[in-house]
Amino acid sequence: MAEITSAKAMARTVRVSPRKSRLILDNIRGKNVADAIAILKFTPNKAAGIIEKVLNSAIANAENNFGLEKANLVVSEAFANEGPTMKRFRPRAKGSASPINKRTSHITVVVAEK
């Protein structure tokens, strides 16, 4: 049986746009977990805080469930898929209305040993 060398964490239906999440995830993909946490800490963005929590969860899964060393971990995969969209309407002039899409994300982070 093969030894497990990666761990995954997900945050589903997070109230942040997938497009904005992907901008942050592109910065940490392939980096050492310590560097990735430092990058997220100093990124002034709502998505960065959420992604930091998911990354810490993936690290905890790797340490507690699979006995991997934190020092050897890198962010092997990081992606944001589109979740359900909440549709709202904003009243406009002359009795019309414009749609507002409140988008959500499913954020996934996978850490693996280098």
Swiss-Prot record:
Chain's gene name:
rplV
Q: Which Pfam families match?
A: Ribosomal_L22 (PF00237)
PANTHER family in the cross-refs = CHLOROPLAST 50S RIBOSOMAL PROTEIN L22-RELATED (PTHR13501), LARGE RIBOSOMAL SUBUNIT PROTEIN UL22M (PTHR13501:SF8)
* Quaternary structure (record): Part of the 50S ribosomal subunit.
- Report the family membership: Belongs to the universal ribosomal protein uL22 family.
Q: What does this protein do?
A: This protein binds specifically to 23S rRNA; its binding is stimulated by other ribosomal proteins, e.g. L4, L17, and L20. It is important during the early stages of 50S assembly. It makes multiple contacts with different domains of the 23S rRNA in the assembled 50S subunit and ribosome.
Q: Which UniProt keywords apply?
A: Ribonucleoprotein, Ribosomal protein, RNA-binding, rRNA-binding
Output the Gene Ontology terms for molecular function. Answer: rRNA binding; structural constituent of ribosome
A single GO BP: translation
Name of this chain's protein: Large ribosomal subunit protein uL22
Q: Name one GO cellular component term.
A: cytosolic large ribosomal subunit
